[in-house]
């Protein structure tokens, strides 16, 4: 029964995390249509990519047995985020933006390669799991914490236009699903970061309940832009994971903060 419950929460986490990973698609369709990244930033997608790669590696059977559902969603997330980064490179609005994105992508590849090779060639058993788990956990916590700037903005402006309800709900549900999955599997490297994600998602929902009837100072087009940025969490999210990643606030890419395990 416990294994079945773990499986069901893992599947639930996969479905919700996939939604968070795909949330920036409208932004990238706009980039492709206009053939320019405009003021959007590629930083969130590179950060979500390294998180997905490390989490997917951690979930592999020879690193962490019985965590294949962690690998499936983060493997899918890595493919999606790679596509985002490629689009960013192709349609970068300036040469500087392209070089910056390329440099970050190279750093992501280097860090992942280092962790993977060291864990594969130099470590075994629990030592391998420890290295990969710590690396994935640190990245996941950083991604989950990234929406703090948006939460601060909501409190400052008293406007939830900066924090879409469905995205906040998805972050909470995703974090909670993976938190319970980690508890059932007795895996601290899944439980700890997603416990943080669940808590921060709950805080976002509380803020939404408090300020949902207020337009605040962020009404109008400014609020719309900030709201779009927040959808790009994913990834992240999360988690997962804000829908645009505007340069004015790269930290909104909590995505796969909110979505990663």
Swiss-Prot record:
The chain crosses the membrane at residues 7-27, 43-63, 72-92, 102-122, 130-150, 165-185, 190-210. It comes from Oryza sativa subsp. indica (Rice). Belongs to the SWEET sugar transporter family. One of its GO terms (cellular component) is plasma membrane. It holds the Pfam family MtN3_slv. Residues 28-42, 93-101, 151-164, 211-261 are cytoplasmic. Mediates transport of sugars across the plasma membrane. Can transport glucose and galactose, but not fructose, mannose and sucrose. Residues 218-261 are annotated as: Disordered. Residues 7-95, 133-215 form the MtN3/slv domain. GO terms for molecular function: protein homodimerization activity; sugar transmembrane transporter activity. Keywords: Cell membrane, Membrane, Repeat, Sugar transport, Transmembrane, Transmembrane helix, Transport. It is a multi-pass membrane protein. It is found in: Cell membrane. Forms homodimers. The keyword Magnesium does not apply. This is Bidirectional sugar transporter SWEET1b. It catalyses: D-glucose(out) = D-glucose(in); D-galactose(in) = D-galactose(out). Residues 1-6, 64-71, 123-129, 186-189 are extracellular. It comes from the Eukaryota. The gene is SWEET1B.
């Amino acid at each position: 029964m416990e294994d079945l419950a773990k499986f069901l929460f893992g599947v639930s986490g996969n479905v919700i995390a996939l939604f968070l990973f795909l949330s920036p698609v409208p932004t990238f369709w706009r980039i492709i249509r206009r053939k320019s990244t405009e003021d959007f930033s590629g930083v969130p997608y590179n950060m979500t990519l390294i998180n997905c790669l490390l989490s997917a590696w951690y979930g592999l059977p020879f690193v962490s047995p019985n965590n294949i559902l962690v690998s499936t969603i983060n493997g899918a997330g890595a493919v999606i985020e790679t596509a985002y980064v490629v689009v960013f490179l192709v349609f970068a609005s300036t040469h500087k933006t392209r070089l910056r994105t390329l440099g970050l992508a190279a750093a992501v590849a280097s860090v992942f390669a280092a962790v993977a090779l060291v864990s594969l060639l130099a470590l075994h058993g629990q030592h391998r799991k420890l290295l990969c788990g710590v690396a994935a956990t640190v990245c996941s916590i950083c991604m989950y914490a990234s929406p703090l700037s948006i939460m601060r903005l909501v409190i400052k402006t008293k406007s939830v236009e900066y924090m879409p309800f469905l995205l906040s709900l998805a972050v909470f549900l995703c974090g909670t699903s993976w938190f319970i999955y980690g508890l059932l599997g007795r895996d601290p490297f899944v439980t700890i970061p997603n416990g943080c994600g669940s808590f921060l998602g709950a805080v976002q929902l509380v803020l939404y309940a408090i300020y949902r009837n207020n337009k605040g100072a962020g009404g109008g087009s400014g609020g719309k832009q900030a709201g779009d940025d927040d959808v790009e969490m994913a990834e992240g999210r999360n988690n997962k994971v804000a829908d645009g990643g505007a340069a004015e606030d790269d930290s909104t890419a909590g995505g796969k903060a909110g979505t990663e395990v």
